[in-house]
A protein has these predicted regions:
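Intrinsically disordered, low-complexity, charged/polar segments
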Residues: 41-68, 110-128
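Detector for Asparagine
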Residues: 18-19, 64, 96
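Short beta-strand-centered aromatic/proline hotspots
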Residues: 11, 19-32
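Short alpha-helix capping/helix-loop boundary micro-motifs
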Residues: 1-3
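Acidic, low-complexity, intrinsically disordered interaction modules
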Residues: 31-50, 69-113
């Protein structure tokens, strides 16, 4: 994988220390090499592109967004370059959807059943906002 193949808002797999895998958002791409900033909630960290396990964007079969996270936390908040804040609230149940909202004031929630659907919404929001 190459940095030029990535976009802000991409959902990527990251290797964990115990050889597991977690999913993160790309929040910023540094221009000085093969490094991007990703996060698990509001804990951003630098990540070399060689450690990425692949972009999840076009994986239509990954349908259960509620399975992405356990539902012990109410919301997972991500802050992107330029100040775009998104909160993800997994809803586990009959429909398995996720609600996402933008901003601190008068948040607007949108429902998503498919990860792919959420990915396109995120790309569009980032493109329109900045």
């Amino acid at each position: 994988m190459d940095v030029k193949d990535l976009r802000i808002g991409d959902i990527v797999g990251i290797k964990t220390l115990n050889n597991g895998k977690t999913f993160c958002f790309i929040q910023e791409i540094k221009c000085d090499g093969d490094v991007c900033i990703v996060s698990e909630d509001e804990d951003p960290f630098d990540c070399h592109v060689s450690t990425l396990l692949g972009v999840k964007a076009e994986h239509h079969h990954f349908s259960n967004m509620g399975a992405w996270y356990d539902d012990k936390k109410v919301e997972h908040i991500f802050t992107f370059k330029g100040g775009l804040r998104i909160a993800i609230r997994p809803q586990v149940g009959t429909e398995n959807y996720t609600a996402a909202r933008i901003g601190e004031y008068k948040p607007k929630y949108c429902r998503f059943t498919y990860l792919h659907e959420f990915q396109h919404w995120l790309w569009d929001m980032y493109r329109i906002s900045f």
